[in-house]
């Protein structure tokens, strides 16, 4: 793991690109200047949700700039296509596709189609440990660094509905932590399948 990390650092340094850390707070700050409140990521202690929204990649990230992503991130590309480099590997991704990035992954956005649409979430590692104190789903045990999984429309709709349920739960006047945890757990098991 150390060798891969060192090689990653050297690769991006050779390309004369400084790796920025892109936190959810930074994404929210960048988006808040141009998008309405409904499209901003919802922050709650331990995790953050980005509801289904139009192409926000070009607002949140600068193309051809590598970003280190803190936190475990799962997402769904619901429309369009993207070309990204994740942990030194280039990917052409078309919707509908599930995406997973482990904490510390390095992502560089290369190209996004105009109809690109995404929804997803970031889970802090300590919150993830709270969700799964004994049996972490294998996909999230730390050995897998990133994954793109094409899905059919049925699986896409399942994930979309769970993200929608989580978003609605978080917008309730009285936030229900147990309900949110149950939905996040269900999402993680779907990604693990």
Task: Describe each model-derived feature in a short phrase.
Residues 157-193:
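An amphipathic alpha-helical interaction segment
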Residues 7, 14-19, 34-37, 109-171:
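A hydrophobic/aromatic-rich effector-binding and dimerization subdomain
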Residues 1-82, 91:
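Generic protein-terminus/edge-of-domain signal
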Residues 83-85, 101, 107-112:
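Short beta-strand His + acidic residue motifs that chelate non-heme Fe in jelly-roll/DSBH
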Residues 77-79, 94, 102, 112:
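A short, compositionally biased micro-patch
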Residues 88-100:
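Short acidic-glycine-tyrosine-enriched beta hairpin
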Residues 74, 98-100, 120-122:
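Conserved hydrophobic/aromatic beta-strand scaffold that supports enzyme active sites
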């Amino acid at each position: 793991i150390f060798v891969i990390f060192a090689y990653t650092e050297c690769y991006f340094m050779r390309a004369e690109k400084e790796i920025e850390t892109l936190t959810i707070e930074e994404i929210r700050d960048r988006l808040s200047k141009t998008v309405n409140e409904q499209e901003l990521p919802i922050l709650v202690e331990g995790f953050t949700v980005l509801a289904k929204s139009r192409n926000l990649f070009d607002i949140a990230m600068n193309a051809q700039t590598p970003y280190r992503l803190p936190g475990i991130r799962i997402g769904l590309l619901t429309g369009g296509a993207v070309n990204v480099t994740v942990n030194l590997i280039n990917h052409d991704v078309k919707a509908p596709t599930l995406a997973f990035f482990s904490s510390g992954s390095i992502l560089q956005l290369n190209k996004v189609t105009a109809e690109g649409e995404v929804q997803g979430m970031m889970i802090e590692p300590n919150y993830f440990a709270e969700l799964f104190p004994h049996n972490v789903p294998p996909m999230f045990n730390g050995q897998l660094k990133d994954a793109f999984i094409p899905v059919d429309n049925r699986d896409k709709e399942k994930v979309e509905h769970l993200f929608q349920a989580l978003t609605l739960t978080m917008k309730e006047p009285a936030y229900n932590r147990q309900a949110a945890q149950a939905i996040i757990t269900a999402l993680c098991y779907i990604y693990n399948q």
